[in-house]
């Protein structure tokens, strides 16, 4: 990244947020090629594997040539038409990957520079980057909250919304025109060979570019939403005129004109949004908004979000995509866990003179449970078991060495144990470990043309214990087993703050 930053510093176009000149810089595509971009995409000739740095630039030039892009089935047979269309799909995939690299790297450099500036003022903590840091936050906050909004963030229904979001950051019109032209042409290209119901701009073939655009769109929405939430704690002391001036830039003019007619009711409406105990977390396309307020307040936030998306981002979200759930009666489905607040009863006997009586003290406890059914479904999809959870052999691995088979199963099992170590109840995790352990034994037995019973009897069951390491065994290397601190760690959930994303823990091939 340092050597790449040196190239961009030499290019004065990026200093003014101009992307278009970067499209024609060869080191951009060389950087993408060297860092694991799908290498077969940027090959001039797949036969001799000769790499060409000019292919994407040529395709961009061709994309502006209407005679090359506009296809007609006149004077051509059916096979030639579809062959040409599939070839055109490949061209758009190449441009998509190249454009994704171009827009990712400068924004990454902006992030790095901002972090370097903040390091001088704040203490750097890598633990806060972990997605598991959300759950200690839940443990600390959920016990004092009442309601939660489970929000499914809507996808943009129009491609122009994605382009308009970038408009505030990208200064050159040429890049925006190229991106807009590419998105519309790619959609039209797919519509000719793909049924309309199956068209998705977030397809796997172009996932990198569209995920970047979607994440950037969500971050833009969150920055405005957090700003408005921060202002809500001061709404009592702000007059309508001052408040209108502060949010004027973030709202549409016609929407604000409509609001102005309700001036005399605005103070009352805004008072209901005053909530100092409001917390917001998100991962991917799902977010959770928790509050200590009442059910009426949560309904206000629900319809506020719907109007906020519609008026500011032109997104239509149906009310059923936002669920209002009391934390005392409902479990939150988030990041592979069912999280809930459970009441534990603690009975204490009290003695006063000659009379004794029992005092029942309910104590709230944060509880996390592994979602066993989706996890078994993922294992079944990866051919480790059937849909009922019965272990089967992994036939595609029978050609590997025994050590490689054991290592693959062990790595998957350790990843699952590492990620789900914070579960309050380990029974579901033990079931997953049993499926993987028996699947490994069946795979080895199938390779050696033997039965599982005979194979385990010949080698012994101890050969599997090396890689199915329990979390307690890891902790025993850090803390003495007989210490009181260690005993509390063994009983309670353990969150590892070195997990930065949810990997495909099952299909770890």
Swiss-Prot record:
Primary localization: plastid
Superkingdom of origin organism: Eukaryota
GO MF annotations in UniProt: RNA binding
Keywords: Chloroplast, mRNA processing, Plastid, RNA-binding, tRNA processing
GO cellular component, one term: chloroplast
GO BP terms: mRNA processing; RNA splicing; tRNA processing
Location within or outside the cell: Plastid, Chloroplast
Entry-linked Pfam families: Intron_maturas2 (PF01348), MatK_N (PF01824)
InterPro entries associated with the record: Domain_X (IPR024937), Maturase_MatK (IPR002866), Maturase_MatK_N (IPR024942)
Family: Belongs to the intron maturase 2 family. MatK subfamily.
General function of this protein: Usually encoded in the trnK tRNA gene intron. Probably assists in splicing its own and other chloroplast group II introns.
PANTHER family: MATURASE K
Protein name, UniProt field: Maturase K
UniProt organism field: Portulaca oleracea (Common purslane)
